[in-house]
């Protein structure tokens, strides 16, 4: 399966990090006296993104979104220890490596993602790790995928973006690559999973 490539999302896919993210947002909101509703915030960031949330709040409250971002990034960095692996994450990464599948990361997380992956002993699985600070347009723009496809001469029909949100499926579709996702989608290139262990089963069945 040498021609196969995986591009991974992190939050909610490889990393069980939403509690740490929500806690960081709560602290940030508290510093600026912004009301915090955990259920509403969770629903919003799953549908859109944390950045979209901060932009909206900054506009509503006449705040500087960059300041909000800095406070949140600092708060989140202090919560790295709360971030754990999703069930089966290490196993599927090891299986992919043993199967000759090239692996990459494209995440909306900042460079703190590198620290987390290093701390969890996962960094060596990836050929390249792109974060929100790598300079690419945010998902669902295909810019980051196009960069990886070109730089590493990847086959778009055998390259999969693995994520947990509709935004991730849209990113794969816009990029002309396959999608593996925890959600159903009308995109014919999407393959739904319920657990990370389903990925190796899917590829073994395809052989």
Language-model segments: residues:
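Short beta->alpha linker loops
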Residues: 45, 49, 87-88, 108-109, ...
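Conserved SAM-binding loop
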Residues: 14, 85, 105-106, 161
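Short glycine- and Lys/Arg-enriched binding-loop motifs that mark or flank ligand-binding interfaces
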Residues: 8, 103, 159
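Short, flexible loop segments at the rims of nucleotide/cofactor-binding pockets, characterized by
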Residues: 79-84, 108, 137-138
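Residue-level detector of anion-binding/catalytic polar loops
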Residues: 35, 102, 178
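N-terminal helical cap/lid subdomain that shapes the substrate entry/recognition surface
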Residues: 2-87, 91
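Asp-based, Mg2+/Mn2+-dependent phosphohydrolase catalytic module
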Residues: 1-4, 30, 66, 94-97, ...
């Amino acid at each position: 399966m040498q021609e196969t490539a995986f591009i991974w999302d992190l939050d909610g896919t490889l990393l069980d990090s939403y509690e740490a993210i929500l806690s960081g947002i709560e602290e940030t909101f508290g510093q600026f006296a912004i009301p915090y509703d955990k259920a509403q915030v969770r629903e919003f960031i799953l549908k859109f993104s944390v950045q979209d949330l901060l932009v909206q709040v900054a506009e509503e409250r006449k705040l500087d979104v960059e300041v909000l971002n800095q406070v949140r990034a600092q708060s989140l960095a202090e919560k790295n220890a709360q971030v754990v692996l999703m069930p089966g994450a290490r196993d599927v990464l090891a299986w992919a490596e043993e199967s000759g599948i090239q692996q990459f990361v494209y995440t909306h997380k900042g460079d703190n993602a590198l620290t987390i992956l290093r701390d969890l002993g996962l960094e060596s699985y990836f050929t390249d790790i792109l974060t929100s600070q790598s300079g690419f347009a945010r998902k669902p723009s295909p810019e980051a995928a196009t960069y990886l496809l070109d730089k590493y001469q990847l086959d778009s029909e055998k390259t999969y973006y693995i994520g947990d949100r509709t935004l991730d499926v849209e990113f794969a579709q816009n990029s002309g690559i396959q999608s593996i996702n925890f959600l159903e989608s009308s995109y014919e290139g999407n393959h739904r999973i319920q657990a990370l262990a389903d990925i190796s089963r899917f590829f073994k069945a395809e052989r």
